[in-house]
């Protein structure tokens, strides 16, 4: 199974467009979105080309592939405008025989993991910082932020053939 794993779009039409271009190029089986899709939140500056109404049709066109979880900036109104579920606090995905736990990261995170078996994969966003480390036998990954990176590079993750690789966009 091939996945694109992204987080923290925060309503940026420009960076969501870059993500859509990558999705079209890579043609993944699923697109995993780890929350904070439309709104920037009170702690963030506005991202480049902040236009949540333009992001809605971009993501809606991918609804058949999207598996999304709620971020700390999502609200019920987001579910009213997006045609795919986006308000669950977490989701589980069986991928190539591994359990993937998907969450935004504002509740569970690599420092406070949910009960998972060794060999599981924990995917979270929220910090806007890329991460790939093992904690107590669980691989923890964070794709960073599509639109408001706090580590200097706009990014997501491509999962293919059992391997994770970071995709970095130039600013």
Model region roles, listed by residue range:
Residues 6, 103, 142-144:
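Thr-Gly-centered strand-to-loop micro-motif
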Residues 2, 92-96, 134-171:
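Binuclear metal-dependent phosphoesterase catalytic core
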Residues 82-131:
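Internal catalytic-core helix/loop-beta-alpha segment
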Residues 2-95:
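Core catalytic region of metal-dependent phosphoesterases/phosphodiesterases
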Residues 21-22, 117, 158:
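Short, solvent-exposed amphipathic alpha-helical segments in soluble enzyme
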């Amino acid at each position: 199974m091939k996945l694109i794993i992204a987080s923290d779009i925060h309503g940026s039409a420009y960076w969501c467009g870059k993500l859509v271009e990558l999705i079209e190029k890579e043609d993944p089986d699923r697109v995993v979105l780890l929350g904070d899709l439309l709104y920037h939140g009170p702690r963030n500056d506005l991202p480049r080309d902040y236009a949540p109404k333009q992001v809605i049709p971009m993501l809606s066109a991918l609804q058949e592939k999207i598996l999304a979880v709620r971020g700390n900036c999502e609200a019920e109104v987001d579910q009213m405008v997006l045609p795919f579920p986006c308000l669950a606090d977490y989701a589980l995905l069986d991928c190539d025989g591994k359990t993937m736990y998907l969450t935004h990261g504002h509740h569970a995170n690599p420092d406070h993991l949910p009960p998972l078996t060794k060999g599981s994969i924990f995917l979270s966003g929220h910090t806007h910082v890329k991460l790939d480390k093992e904690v107590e036998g669980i691989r923890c990954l964070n794709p960073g932020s599509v639109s408001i990176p706090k580590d200097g590079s706009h990014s997501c993750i491509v999962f293919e053939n059992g391997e994770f690789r970071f995709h970095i966009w130039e600013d």
